[in-house]
Every structure is written in C-alpha cells, then in structure tokens.
C-alpha cells in the first residue's frame, strides 16, 4: 500500500503514473530482496513470484522499464529465468512488452479502474452468495475475527495493517465460496487492485464504513441468506468504487 503516492489524472482521462527509468526501481528491488522477500530458489517460478510481489507492492513502479540485465543482477540469475518471468507476467497483465524497447511495468488508466470495479462488483457478489449458501465450518468466525483485527488496526490508524487485513477478509470470503474458477478470477482482480497507487482506506471515515459493510455481509452469510449476502457485497463494492475514484481524482 502506497498511500504517499498520489496520482494525477492525465489529459486522456487516465492515471498519470510518472515515467520511470529502470535504475531507481531496480535499486528499490535490490533493497526489497535484501530485506527478506522470499526468493526460495533461482528457478523461473521463484523469480516470477518475487517479481510479481515487487510489482504488487509498488517496489517496481508503474511505467518503470524492466531491463533484463539489471533484473538478472538483482536476482543473481542468468537472463533466461528473467526473460521467462517477464513473459509470464506479461500474460498476467502486470508487464507490457514492446518489440523494440523491452518490457515495462503496466499502468492502469482511469478507464481500466472503472472496468475493474464493474467486474469486481459481480465477482464479489457471487462469492458472497456462494459463501452464504455453503457456509463452510469456521467461515463466519474467521470473517468476524479478521474484522475485529481490522477494528483494532483502524483504532491505531495503521493503514498498512488495515489494508492487509482487508485483503485477508476478502480472501476468506472467496475461499468460503469454494469455487476454484471464481477464486482464480478474484485473485486476478486483487492483483489489479493492489497495483493502484493509493488505498481507499485513507479516505476520511472509510475504515468505519468498511467494518460495517463487512459485518453486514458476514451476518447474511451466518444466516445462509445468499441473496442478501450478495446485495451487501455488491453495495460494498459500489461504495469502494466511489471512494477509489475520489482518492484517485483527489476528491
């Protein structure tokens, strides 16, 4: 979560992520890896996973150029796993590859954000409905426990911890839906949300709203009321979209 990076809107209606040279981002990547981000080995899978997290955590900034030689040096590997990792991340939409200029971290436009939240509302609503109908053992207790931890983080004004717990709450809900395809699609949505340059939880009053919205979903899940759970989850996402746009546009 990078609440200190406030975007501006471009003339084309997008988010103006400042153009980045590769050097600064790669220096941050070296520090990130040195601080203990897990690269369990030097395989393509290991490198891909670590690079993905670096993008999602904002260490590799939107629009930053990704030079194979610099990345290979940072990861202490040859260019081969770097090249394959960039290809995989391009397939996931996290990296953009060009014919003559190499690869760069993908940036999201304002139009992308709007499209993202349309899909997110549908998918989160479906996850809530399925979770309520199936209500696996321990799910309601897990949702309530995470929400209680969020309340404590909000009281401390710990936005970073609050954001992590918010992700955990939504992961628990979609896991409770017990649909592997839905979980996969929502994982991709989460990746896109994590790439945005600010969190809605910095907006005044939003943490308390989120806690109440989560509780409404959890109570519907507890009652096994799929229709009401979906309604609350959709309302939660619509409000999230409103706040997201306010944060991005400086409102």
Predicted regions span which residues?
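Short linear motifs at protein or domain termini
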Residues: 1-133, 241-251
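Hydrophobic alpha-helical segments typical of transmembrane helices
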Residues: 51, 81, 112, 169, ...
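Residue-level signal for the nucleotide or nucleotide-sugar donor/cofactor binding architecture
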Residues: 77, 205, 224
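Short coil/turn segments
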Residues: 135-136, 206
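Mobile beta-alpha loop/short-helix "lid" or hinge segments that flank ligand
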Residues: 90-96, 189-191, 205-208
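Short amphipathic alpha-helical interaction/hinge segments
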Residues: 193-197, 201-204, 241-248
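Conserved amphipathic alpha-helical segments that form helical-bundle/coiled-coil interaction surfaces
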Residues: 116, 137-198, 212-220, 228-239
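Bacterial carbohydrate/catabolite-sensing allosteric modules
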Residues: 11-12, 157, 224
């Amino acid at each position: 979560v990078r609440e200190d990076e406030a975007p501006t809107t471009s003339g084309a209606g997008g988010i103006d992520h400042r153009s980045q040279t590769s050097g600064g981002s790669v220096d941050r990547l070296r520090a990130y890896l040195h601080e203990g981000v897990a690269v369990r080995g030097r395989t393509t899978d290991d490198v891909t996973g670590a690079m993905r997290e670096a993008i999602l955590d904002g260490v590799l900034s939107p629009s930053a150029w990704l030079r194979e030689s610099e990345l290979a040096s940072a990861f202490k590997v040859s260019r081969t796993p770097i090249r394959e990792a960039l290809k995989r991340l391009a397939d996931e939409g996290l990296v953009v590859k060009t014919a003559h200029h190499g690869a760069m971290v993908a940036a999201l436009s304002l139009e992308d954000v709007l499209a993202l939240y349309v899909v997110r509302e549908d998918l989160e609503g479906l996850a809530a409905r399925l979770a309520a109908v199936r209500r696996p053992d321990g799910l309601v207790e897990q949702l309530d426990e995470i929400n209680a931890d969020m309340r404590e983080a909000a009281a401390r004004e710990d936005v970073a911890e609050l954001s992590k717990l918010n992700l955990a709450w939504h992961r628990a809900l979609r896991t409770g839906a017990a649909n592997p395809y839905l979980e996969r699609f929502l994982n991709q949505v989460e990746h896109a949300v994590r790439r945005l340059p600010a969190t809605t939880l910095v907006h005044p009053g939003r943490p308390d709203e989120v806690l109440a919205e989560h509780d409404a979903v959890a109570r519907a899940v507890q009652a096994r009321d799929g229709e009401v759970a979906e309604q609350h989850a959709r309302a939660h996402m619509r409000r999230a979209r409103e706040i997201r746009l306010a944060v991005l546009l400086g409102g």
